A protein has these predicted regions:
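Conserved, well-ordered active-site substructure
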Residues: 258-264
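An N-terminally biased module of ancient metal coordination in phosphate/nucleic-acid-related enzymes
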Residues: 1-80, 162-169, 181-196, 200-255
Length: 264
């Protein structure tokens, strides 16, 4: 899967989220939006779930767009969250079992976070959060929306800055694999493993260490990465002979599908 060779330049987006995790639009809606943008190939990469893939494939079949079944796996390394994208994933028993454990852990984590907010005098319930989580995955943006809804913060950014961001009073760790385990899991499910948004790791030494694992590629182009960043990651990809990919990391109307600074 040498992505940049098989895809017509500028007509793809390999990092998209739907309501199956923390996106605002259903898989069908995301596929239709991508088609309207003139994209020909997209990857659905929800956090720790494959739940949106089937719906996306069915919609894509009707409108003639190619779907790469994907995932964004949560892993942890040296205290940092490292997201690993998996492409051309098949739902194996092993993968389903790990994802089920991660889902249960997220649900328990959600209850712990709710409890922390309540202790700070901000009463929110699981029901408040489930209004925003349309899939099986409950993620922090869903909790943040419920907090804003109750009038405890002006917007979701404020919720993250004050309460939910890493190290903040209501933060709780999610279940995260090691990068090596995540990469192996993707490989055993027939997939290709790619390091997501390296800039967001905020440590190029760690990025280089990750390139020395059995990972297949790196997300050179991402909406938060400048041209300068992309050049740096391109050099790294060449140095370690890794595949180069790109995606918008689309979640909601604040982001543009297909816009991630890719230059052929």
């Amino acid at each position: 899967l040498e992505i940049l060779k098989i895809i017509e330049n500028g007509r793809f987006d390999l990092h998209l989220h739907t309501t199956a995790s923390d996106g605002s639009f259903s898989p069908s809606e995301v596929v239709k939006m991508a088609a309207q943008k003139g994209l020909t190939t997209i990857a659905i990469t929800d956090h720790d779930t494959l739940d949106g893939i089937q719906e996306a494939i069915e919609t894509a079949r009707k409108i003639g767009i190619t779907i790469i079944p994907g995932i964004e796996l949560s892993t942890k390394y040296k205290g940092k969250t490292i997201d690993i994208l998996g492409y051309n994933i098949h739902e194996t028993k092993e993968l389903s079992s790990v994802l089920q454990k991660m889902r249960k852990h997220r649900q328990n984590r959600c209850l712990l976070i709710v409890n922390k907010f309540c202790k700070l005098g901000m009463t929110i319930t699981l029901e408040d959060i489930q209004k925003y989580s349309k899939g099986n995955v409950i993620a922090r943006p869903h909790i943040a929306k419920a907090v804003v809804d109750k009038g405890y913060a002006k917007d979701t950014q404020e919720v993250f800055d004050l309460y939910l961001g890493d190290g903040k009073p209501c933060a709780e760790d999610k279940m995260e694999l090691s990068p090596s385990s995540g990469i192996e899991l993707i490989h055993r499910a027939g997939g290709v493993a790619v390091l997501a948004h390296p800039l967001l790791i905020h440590d190029d030494i760690i990025v280089e260490e990750l390139m020395q694992l059995a990972i297949d590629g790196i997300e050179v182009w991402h909406r938060k990465q400048s041209e300068e960043d992309s050049k740096r990651y391109k050099s790294l990809a060449k140095k370690y002979r890794k595949m180069m990919t790109g995606g918008s990391d689309f979640h909601n109307e604040e982001h543009e599908i297909g816009e991630f600074g890719f230059e052929s």
